């Protein structure tokens, strides 16, 4: 009887592991084939060779870019170099990347920028908020942008016990922002186990100097986050669940889920087209190739546009797809006046005229 029970438990365990392995491979797009969709007028931006994980474009057309992210399990072509923030003027005929100088007093050697978000104050001062992972911790850095000097002045470092494994942020007021937590565990092995078991323990946080709280939870891997043009709705990407959550924002900053838009790809960062209100999503169509990077068979890139977000049937269309021959590991796409920038975790940056 004991042997029979043991064999039954062993069989059930093996069946569970097999099911999770198959689900894990499928969730990371291990079998997805890519059909190329590429605008004709595209060029790679010179000087951006080590990633452009997140991009935020001001109404003036100045684009901030975080570069050089060192993320557990992901490739990095310049592991000994600190991260950087670049600026691109989308109004230029041939846009070029310019590294922004950071003021003294900030620990540049451990700068590891991830998600970014801009905020323009009433006096038109531009502030850049950056998710930073110094020594693989999570902080949010606040910089003031000096446009004439093309530099960043570091103002403040935000730390909090809830701000762990932070991926992205969207700023809605002075020191008021939503942040996504992409893993419950900060240990890399436990984080992998968390993904393997699909625990849905990640969340969205709200931060202000007076209050820090969880405002939405139950995500497989909360990733990109942005806000609608009228600031009434918050859009959250759940990467490994392959969907986008549409959340209503309340006066107390709590979020209520209205709908979920299902996509057949791993969703990373989100942005909103300022002309239409459409969501643009940087995606990973074959995420398993990110975890097992092979330069001979690189991960591809994909950008989706979601129109009529609040309708019963949002329309999803493909803006860009590449098998990795041009662009590897896309994370974000941001548009300005018919032009688009597509960023990556560790690779290059693509500029296209749509």
Curated annotation (Swiss-Prot):
The modification Phosphoserine is found at residue 165. Its cofactor is Ca(2+). This is Serum paraoxonase/lactonase 3. SUPFAM superfamilies: Calcium-dependent phosphotriesterase. It comes from the Eukaryota. InterPro entries: 6-blade_b-propeller_TolB-like (IPR011042), Arylesterase (IPR002640), Paraoxonase2 (IPR008364), Serum_paraoxonase/arylesterase (IPR051288). Has low activity towards the organophosphate paraxon and aromatic carboxylic acid esters. Rapidly hydrolyzes lactones such as statin prodrugs (e.g. lovastatin). Hydrolyzes aromatic lactones and 5- or 6-member ring lactones with aliphatic substituents but not simple lactones or those with polar substituents. It catalyses: a phenyl acetate + H2O = a phenol + acetate + H(+); An aryl dialkyl phosphate + H2O = dialkyl phosphate + an aryl alcohol; an N-acyl-L-homoserine lactone + H2O = an N-acyl-L-homoserine + H(+). The keyword rRNA processing does not apply.
């Amino acid at each position: 009887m004991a042997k029979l029970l043991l064999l039954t438990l062993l069989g059930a365990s093996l069946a569970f592991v097999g099911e999770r392995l198959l689900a894990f491979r499928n969730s990371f797009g291990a079998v997805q084939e890519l059909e190329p969709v590429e605008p004709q007028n595209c060029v790679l931006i010179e000087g951006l060779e080590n990633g452009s994980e997140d991009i935020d474009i001001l109404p003036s057309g100045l684009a901030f870019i975080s570069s050089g992210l060192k993320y557990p399990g992901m490739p990095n072509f310049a592991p000994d170099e600190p991260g950087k923030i670049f600026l691109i003027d989308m109004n230029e005929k041939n846009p070029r990347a310019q590294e922004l100088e950071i003021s003294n007093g900030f620990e540049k050697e451990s700068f590891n920028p991830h998600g970014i978000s801009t905020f323009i104050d009433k006096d038109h001062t531009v502030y850049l908020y950056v998710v930073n992972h110094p020594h693989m911790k999570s902080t949010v850095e606040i910089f003031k942008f000096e446009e004439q000097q093309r530099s960043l002045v570091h103002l403040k470092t935000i730390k909090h016990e809830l701000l762990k494994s932070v991926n992205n942020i969207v700023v809605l007021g002075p020191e008021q922002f939503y942040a996504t937590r992409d893993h419950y565990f900060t240990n890399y092995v436990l984080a992998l186990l968390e993904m393997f078991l699909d625990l849905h323990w990640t969340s969205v946080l709200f931060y202000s100097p007076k209050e820090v709280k969880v405002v939405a939870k139950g995500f497989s891997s909360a990733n990109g986050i942005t806000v609608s043009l009228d600031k009434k709705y918050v859009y959250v990407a759940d990467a490994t669940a392959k969907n986008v959550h549409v959340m209503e924002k309340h006066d107390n900053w709590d979020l209520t889920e209205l709908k979920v838009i299902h996509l057949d790809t791993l969703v990373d960062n989100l942005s909103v087209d300022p002309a239409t209100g459409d969501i643009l999503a940087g995606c990973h169509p074959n995420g398993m190739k990110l975890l097992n990077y092979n330069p001979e068979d690189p991960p591809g890139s994909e950008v989706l546009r979601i129109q009529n977000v609040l309708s019963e049937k949002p329309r999803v269309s493909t803006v860009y797809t590449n098998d990795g021959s041009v662009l590897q590991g896309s994370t974000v796409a941001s548009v300005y006046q018919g032009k688009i920038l597509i960023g990556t975790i560790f690779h290059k940056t693509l500029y296209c005229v749509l």
